[in-house]
């Protein structure tokens, strides 16, 4: 299936929706401006998640869900994902034969039943939105650029390549994986910026200079933002020290087995690597790999390539995250836009709280915003 729908997820395909994503970013800035004007502490981490959900809605379905506009957890999706994710992580890591046992046996456990129902609520949304898209004329669908329309066009153009259930599953996965991964990354970026004021100052200076010399314009284009060296270094380093997806990514040893670092693995052995471990490898990232230091990404092109090759935040090889272009577009567009307009500070001196449930969920990212005088 991945090969069939792959063209819908290319960077070129994603950026056809950049104008619509700009509207989500601008609405988000208006909401953040309200918090700045009120001078009130607010849950910045939750709002970053709401932005991520609306970004997914816009690019995948053609319009935002309404999280930002209505200032609510639209449809209870955030609560549903957070409730379902611990169960999903257990099911995903369990052997195939054990998965139905966990799901069906869990119905008798209130917490697990609640998680199953929460996940099913998102599935029903995916089905409903797909049915609406199917009701459009074929000609109308072919002119649209959202990913759902692109996938439905592929289904029509290549009979037998996809079932409608395949489309439902694809959209269900997009809502869950596309939102939590990006919001987790954004929370990490801003958390580490706030914890390292010198890094924040340097990045803001780069953004201001880019606007002054015209290399950044409004709205910020993804093609412009990725050329900012220090912005890229900050995002890369944040993803390195705190990857939003941190579980072993299982693979099976091939026929005949193989040897890795002096250890023989027989055929069929299940093995995996965790980004949270790999991305702290001192041989690749340096003796100070435990530290948040974006400057390591600026030391040389060769070192950048070596470190980037070792990053597992979006997976690797044929199993690279298919939605990574959307996630990166949201990050590279919204981070400089926020820092151009606002000074962001933690509202307390407490550390954030984290919980790993496949996606690492962070909380207690409570902030205050102040409009910048030169905004």
Curated annotation (Swiss-Prot):
Pfam families in the record: p450 (PF00067)
The record, for InterPro entries, names: Cyt_P450, Cyt_P450_CS, Cyt_P450_E_grp-I, Cyt_P450_sf, Cytochrome_P450_monoxygenase
Question: What GO molecular function annotations does the UniProt record carry, in alphabetical order?
Answer: heme binding; iron ion binding; monooxygenase activity; oxidoreductase activity, acting on paired donors, with incorporation or reduction of molecular oxygen
* Annotated SUPFAM superfamilies: Cytochrome P450
Annotated EC: 1.-.-.-
- Tell me the PANTHER family matching this sequence: CYTOCHROME P450 (PTHR24305), P450, PUTATIVE (EUROFUNG)-RELATED (PTHR24305:SF229)
Name this protein carries in UniProt: Cytochrome P450 monooxygenase ACRTS1
Q: What is the lineage of its organism?
A: Eukaryota, Fungi, Dikarya, Ascomycota, Pezizomycotina
């Amino acid at each position: 299936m991945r090969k069939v729908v792959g063209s819908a997820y290319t960077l070129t395909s994603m950026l056809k929706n950049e104008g619509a994503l700009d509207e989500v970013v601008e609405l988000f800035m208006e909401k953040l401006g309200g918090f700045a004007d009120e001078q009130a502490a607010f849950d910045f981490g939750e709002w970053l998640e709401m932005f991520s959900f609306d970004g997914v809605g816009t690019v995948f379905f053609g319009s935002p869900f309404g999280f930002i506009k209505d200032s609510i957890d639209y449809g209870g999706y955030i609560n549903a994902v957070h409730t379902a994710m611990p169960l999903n992580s257990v099911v995903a890591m369990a052997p195939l034969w054990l998965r139905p046992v966990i799901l069906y046996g869990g119905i008798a456990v209130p917490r697990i039943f609640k998680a199953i129902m929460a996940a099913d609520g998102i599935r029903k949304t995916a089905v409903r939105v797909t049915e609406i898209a199917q009701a459009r004329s074929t000609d109308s669908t072919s002119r649209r650029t959202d990913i759902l329309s692109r996938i439905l066009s592929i289904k029509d153009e290549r009979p037998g390549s996809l079932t409608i259930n395949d489309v439902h599953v694809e959209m269900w996965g997009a809502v869950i994986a596309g939102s939590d991964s990006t919001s987790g990354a954004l929370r990490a970026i801003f958390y580490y910026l706030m914890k390292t004021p010198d890094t924040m100052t340097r990045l803001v200076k780069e953004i201001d200079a880019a606007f002054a010399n015209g290399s950044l314009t409004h709205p910020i284009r993804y093609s412009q933002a990725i050329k900012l060296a220090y912005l890229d270094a900050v995002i890369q380093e944040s993803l390195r020290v705190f990857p939003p997806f941190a579980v072993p990514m299982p693979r099976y040893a091939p026929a005949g087995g193989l040897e890795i670092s002096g250890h023989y693995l027989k055929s069929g052995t299940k093995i995996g690597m965790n980004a949270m471990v790999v991305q702290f490898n001192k041989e690749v990232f340096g003796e100070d790999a435990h530290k948040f230091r974006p400057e390591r990404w600026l030391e040389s092109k060769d070192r950048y390539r070596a470190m980037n090759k070792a990053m597992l935040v979006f997976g690797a090889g044929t199993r690279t995250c298919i939605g990574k272009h959307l996630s990166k577009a949201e990050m590279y567009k919204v981070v400089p836009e926020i820092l151009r307009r606002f000074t962001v500070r933690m509202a307390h001196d407490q550390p954030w709280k984290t919980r790993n449930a496949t996606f690492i969920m962070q909380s207690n990212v409570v902030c205050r915003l102040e409009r910048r005088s030169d905004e």
